[in-house]
Amino acid sequence: MWYVSTRGIAPRVNFEGALFSGYAPDGGLFMPEELPQLDRKTLCQWSTLSYPGLVKELCALFIGSELIPKDELNDLIDRAFSRFRHREVVHLSRLRNGLNVLELWHGVTYAFKDLSLSCTAQFLQYFLEKREKHVTVVVGTSGDTGSAAIESVQGAKNMDIIVLLPKGHCTKIQELQMTTVLKENVHVFGVEGNSDELDEPIKTVFADVAFVKKHNLMSLNSINWSRVLVQMAHHFFAYFQCMPSLDTHPLPLVEVVVPTGAAGNLAAGYIAQKIGLPVRLVVAVNGNDIIHRTVQQGDFSLSEAVKSTLASAMDIQVPYNMERVFWLLSGSDSQVTRALMEQFERTQSVNLPKELHSKLSEAVTSVSVSDEAITQTMGRCWDENQYLLCPHSAVAVNYHYQQMDRQQPSTPRCCLAPASAAKFPEAVLAAGLTPETPAEIVALEHKETRCTPMRRGDNWMLMLRDTIEDLSRRWRSHALNTSR
């Protein structure tokens, strides 16, 4: 399986090449050159698989066995999920009035990113040990990515991780999950800015191809293909858990409601749809509504500023993975995609061509949900089910309630729940409810923290480059000492 850039200029790479890249050298994102097609028979066979079983099948489709033999791939995936709290890894809660909530948050950091990042870290370690190499992972986070990335690679001998977090823009628990990890391969910076601002120095550093190559830099943000690949399993599992029967022709549709920030989960769902999964995708966003405006009006443009909302991990203005969706919608036309994205990077505003917009609105429905609607949804779900939603999950469930109240004809529907309510006590209190906090999260309050400030007025890019160069020097000196 080969991977090509959405912008069509960078040379194609295999899975290992895509895994170790953030952006492609031409600024695009890697995508499979050809998508496999799943027939009815395969879908019927997969319908009885567990969540880890689905991850194994999907990864085997997109990672050649010449790179990772199937038995070894299965072992890596089992190892990735070994620390999850739920025996199913992912669990579907069936609640009143047809509300299905797929809990993607049973990993160590109580967020869905544990699923894709734990697998991605295993794949990285596999190749690094084989090649006797070291990488420095650079991550910008709006909340959950940083802690899940740190958790997945902390203590790894072939990897260092640098995380930039937006001070004051993620919850106290999210921040503590990052700053209390004191392993020597973990380096956390608290940035005086929002998540889009802290992405700028990262993007600038990654644009220096020679620097990236010299220091073996990579990203674990949602642009990494491996994360999108694993996230496809959410949609397959949601489908098989919620479909009424496989006996009908054609196979029944299931609506999957995807709370969306950087759109990695949406891209995964759209690829799942393209390879044969009969899902209808609903993008649910908070007040940062660029994707909603794109779906409704073809208006892919920045607002004046990021809005702080209760669903803080989705407070994102630039949903990078939409580039993957545009590329697929355009029939893998890299010229169209490159022109769109370069205009967006230049002017922060693009009106989608009519044909592209029409294809997008056929493939995806969207909804934007206010903070008031988030807290109302959390309250209603508790009243009806004694079930606590996190604010991001409430964005998805709000769509379900809207459809139910309008008495729309009922397609089976699954709402993805990206995080546990335990991570967002402030939002739970705002909804007039009582937070439930697990002991591991309470314990964070009493742990030692480590975090280097990046203040307004500091040269963030220079600080980042200096840290990377220092880590490279340390690794070279370590490698020299161990080879003697």
Swiss-Prot record:
Its cofactor is pyridoxal 5'-phosphate. It comes from the Eukaryota. Gene3D superfamilies: 3.40.50.1100, Threonine synthase, N-terminal domain. InterPro entries: Thr_synth_N (IPR029144), Thr_synth_N_sf (IPR037158), Thr_synthase-like (IPR004450), Threonine_Synthase (IPR051166), TrpB-like_PALP (IPR001926), TrpB-like_PALP_sf (IPR036052). One of its GO terms (molecular function) is lyase activity. CDD domains: Thr-synth_2 (cd01560). One of its GO terms (biological process) is serine family amino acid catabolic process. The modification N6-(pyridoxal phosphate)lysine is found at K113. Keywords: Lyase, Pyridoxal phosphate. Its EC number is 4.2.3.-. PANTHER family: THREONINE SYNTHASE FAMILY MEMBER (PTHR42690), THREONINE SYNTHASE-LIKE 2 (PTHR42690:SF1). Acts as a catabolic phospho-lyase on both gamma- and beta-phosphorylated substrates. Degrades O-phospho-threonine (PThr) to alpha-ketobutyrate, ammonia and phosphate. Belongs to the threonine synthase family. This is Threonine synthase-like 2. It comes from Pongo abelii. The gene is THNSL2.
